[in-house]
């Protein structure tokens, strides 16, 4: 009797039940990852939530989590791979500006040390006298806004003097004072000259050009270059009144911009020796 039942059961043993939904399927699919049989609806690993996927996901999470070293510090693989990727343009530009700023600060500190006490005294006396004259002129308008700066630049272009051979796109329009320290010729020092120079020039060449435009006596430039006879100074930005010397080897395009006020300070023989 039992043999007959076994034989009958064997005859009916066609197809297999799906391990996921228990539905009988005559063409079952065998999953080699979890070693189970599934119907056509659950033949994929994702469809029957294969154990291999779950185990693989746990291993992946373990590998991805930060591992702690002996000293307790954690090493993040994700941070390491991000460091290998190029940074965004905005981040790169910000980092370049941050690295350039200290360079300019260190350069300014070095240049400031080249202004000896007599030169500083000369330019400060000139500046104080000039500011006092401005404060007495109460009717003078304030041109501090950006819109007024545009008007100022347009007016400066109309009266500025310079070499007509300089291309229009290379011209930088400035105001320039000659600071000589000669008390007998204060009117000449108080004259602010509207000029334009070439932004492609070295500062040393601009100093030569400015000394000629400011009608410096020819005897001043004999037996020596204007770089030795003069220092080109500029007022630092900020509330505190402070000047720095623009080095002759620097470029105009990097140091001078439109509407800047420059001070061409004459060095006497005894000042150079200090």
UniProtKB/Swiss-Prot annotation:
GO molecular-function terms, A-Z: proteasome binding; zinc ion binding
Predominant location: cytoplasm
Modified residues (Phosphoserine): 273
Gene3D superfamilies: AN1-like Zinc finger
Region (Ubiquitin-like): 170-266
Factors inducing expression: By transcriptional activator RPN4.
Positions with a binding annotation for Zn(2+) 1: 18, 21, 39, 42
Entry-linked SMART domains: ZnF_AN1 (SM00154)
ZnF region ranges: AN1-type: 12-58
Cellular localisation: Cytoplasm; Nucleus
GO cellular component annotations of the record: cytoplasm; nucleus
Pfam short name (any one): zf-AN1
Subunit field text: Interacts (via its ubiquitin-like domain) with CDC48 (via N-terminus). Associates with the 26S proteasome. Specifically interacts with the regulatory particle (RP) subunit RPN2. Exposure to arsenite, a known inducer of protein misfolding resulting in accumulation of polyubiquitinated conjugates, enhances the association with the proteoasome. Binds to ubiquitinated proteins conjugated to a 4 or more molecule ubiquitin chain. Binding to ubiquitinated proteins is zinc-dependent.
Job description of the protein: Promotes efficient arsenite-induced clearance of stress granules (SGs). May have a role in the ubiquitin-proteasome system (UPS) protecting cells from metalloid-induced proteotoxicity.
Extra information: Present with 4280 molecules/cell in log phase SD medium.
Protein name (database record): CDC48-associated ubiquitin-like/zinc finger protein 1
Organism this protein belongs to: Saccharomyces cerevisiae (strain ATCC 204508 / S288c) (Baker's yeast)
Encoding gene per record: CUZ1
């Amino acid at each position: 009797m039992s043999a007959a039942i076994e034989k009958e059961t064997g005859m009916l043993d066609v197809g297999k039940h799906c391990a996921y939904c228990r539905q009988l399927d005559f063409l079952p699919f065998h999953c080699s990852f979890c070693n189970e049989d599934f119907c056509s609806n659950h033949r994929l690993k994702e469809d029957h939530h294969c154990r291999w996927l779950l185990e693989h996901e746990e291993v992946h999470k373990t590998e991805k989590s930060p591992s702690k070293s002996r000293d307790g510090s954690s090493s993040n693989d994700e941070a390491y791979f991000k460091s290998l990727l190029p940074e965004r343009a905005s981040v790169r530009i910000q980092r370049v500006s941050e690295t350039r700023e200290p360079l300019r600060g260190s350069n300014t500190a070095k240049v400031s040390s080249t202004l000896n006490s007599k030169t500083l005294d000369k330019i400060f006396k000139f500046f104080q006298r000039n500011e006092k004259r401005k404060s007495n002129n109460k009717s003078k308008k304030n041109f501090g806004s950006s819109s007024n700066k545009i008007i100022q630049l347009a007016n400066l272009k109309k009266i500025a003097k310079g070499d007509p051979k300089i291309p229009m796109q290379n011209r930088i329009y400035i105001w320039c004072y000659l600071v000589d320290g000669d008390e007998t010729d204060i009117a000449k020092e108080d004259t602010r000259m509207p000029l334009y120079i070439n932004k492609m020039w070295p500062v040393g060449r601009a100093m030569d050009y400015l000394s000629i435009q400011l009608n410096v006596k020819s005897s001043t430039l004999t037996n020596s270059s204007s770089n030795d006879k003069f220092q080109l100074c500029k007022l630092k930005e900020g509330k505190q009144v402070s000047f720095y010397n623009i080095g002759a080897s620097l470029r105009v395009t990097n140091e001078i911009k439109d509407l800047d006020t420059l001070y061409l300070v004459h060095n006497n023989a005894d000042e150079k020796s200090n």
